[in-house]
């Protein structure tokens, strides 16, 4: 393994330095990561440690912006330590850097559900190639660069009111990306009673994650959860999860019922699955009875579809900036003036249910 770190292109010139804690039991990995991050002007390794106990001790007295956390550690595991890290510093971003969190694994989905901001694959010992430093910086930049230009007056949480829904609630659509699994846990945790309507969910995840994700989600809620399939007739109090290789769209069955029609075409923004086609299809089928929820995530997926829902008489709720891992998707719909409320996930589902019943 070479000690040289390739030149890294970092595109955010005015962002403040991200103070980082590296937690890995390999001295080689800790050294390589430190060299990579310190070679970039936007990152600084504040501390390195080999186990979770020392990391928690450091965080008791110090504040960092980012924790790079391995899963397999001596003593307490990284997964066991993750909730404790977030309790000590709720605003910190934790990226799992592990060779044991393969794409689609149960450990990866569990880490995301526990609050990890991202999952990064760590090369095996001695195999840190020339591509890894830039790939690492690029992934971390996505966590810290995404701040759309939204007027400051629109960044505040709006006071949610259940008034002014123009039609009874018929369907809820949820879109999420980075940080979304943890936000979904909070969202469903706050649900006090059955909804009485179907829920469509698009979370940006590869297809290999879908089964584990649906299983994890089923443990978060009393609602029925299934991976959406073409031909599914929408049932109330059922969550239909978009598979990682298709968009959820809807059509009417021969008997007039709303039915799932999966579409494998990638959206114009490059997302698959995409929130935009799901929202647009909800607007077509349910009109003013459609309600959309936009949770934390990078990019602007969901804004075009949210515009379709609002144009059809429906309404949109977005996650607030303070509770978002990345305020890209929700910030975009807020900036476009499409939201009736901006709030943390815990109260969203009850707010949506109350607002829909007021219209009824």
How would you name each of these model-derived features?
Residues 1-22, 26-42, 48, 53-68, ...:
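Conserved acid/base catalytic micro-environments in cytosolic active-site loops
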């Amino acid at each position: 393994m070479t000690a040289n770190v390739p030149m890294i292109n970092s595109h955010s010139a005015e962002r403040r330095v991200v103070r980082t804690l590296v937690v890995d039991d390999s001295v080689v990995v800790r050294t390589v990561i430190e060299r990579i991050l310190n070679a970039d002007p936007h990152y600084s390794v504040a501390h390195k440690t080999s186990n979770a106990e020392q990391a928690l001790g450091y965080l008791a007295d110090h504040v960092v912006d980012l924790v790079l956390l391995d899963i397999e550690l001596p003593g307490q595991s990284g997964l066991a330590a993750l909730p404790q890290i977030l309790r000590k510093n709720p605003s910190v971003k934790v990226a799992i850097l592990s060779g044991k969190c393969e794409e689609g694994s149960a450990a990866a989905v569990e880490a995301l559900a526990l609050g990890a901001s991202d999952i990064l694959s760590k090369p095996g010992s001695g195999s840190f190639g020339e591509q890894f430093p830039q790939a690492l910086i690029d992934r971390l930049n996505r966590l810290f660069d995404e701040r759309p230009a939204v007027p400051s007056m629109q960044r505040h949480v709006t006071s949610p009111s259940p008034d002014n829904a123009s039609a009874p609630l018929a369907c809820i659509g949820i879109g999420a990306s980075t940080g979304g699994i943890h936000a979904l846990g909070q969202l469903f945790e706050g649900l006090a009673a059955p909804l009485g309507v179907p829920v469509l969910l698009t979370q940006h995840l590869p297809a290999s994650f879908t089964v584990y994700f649906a299983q994890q989600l089923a443990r978060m809620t009393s609602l029925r959860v299934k991976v959406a399939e073409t031909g599914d007739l929408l049932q109330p109090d059922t969550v239909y999860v978009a598979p990682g290789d298709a968009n959820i769209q809807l059509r009417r069955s021969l008997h007039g019922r709303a039915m799932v029609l999966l579409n494998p075409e990638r959206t114009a923004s490059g997302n698959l699955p995409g929130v935009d086609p799901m929202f647009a299809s909800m607007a077509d089928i349910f009109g003013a009875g459609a309600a959309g929820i936009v949770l934390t995530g990078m990019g602007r997926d969901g804004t075009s579809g949210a515009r379709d829902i609002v144009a059809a008489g429906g309404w949109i709720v977005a996650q607030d900036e303070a509770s978002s891992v990345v305020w890209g998707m929700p910030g975009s719909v807020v900036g476009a003036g499409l939201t009736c409320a901006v709030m943390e996930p815990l109260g969203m589902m009850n707010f949506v249910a109350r607002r829909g019943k007021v219209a009824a």
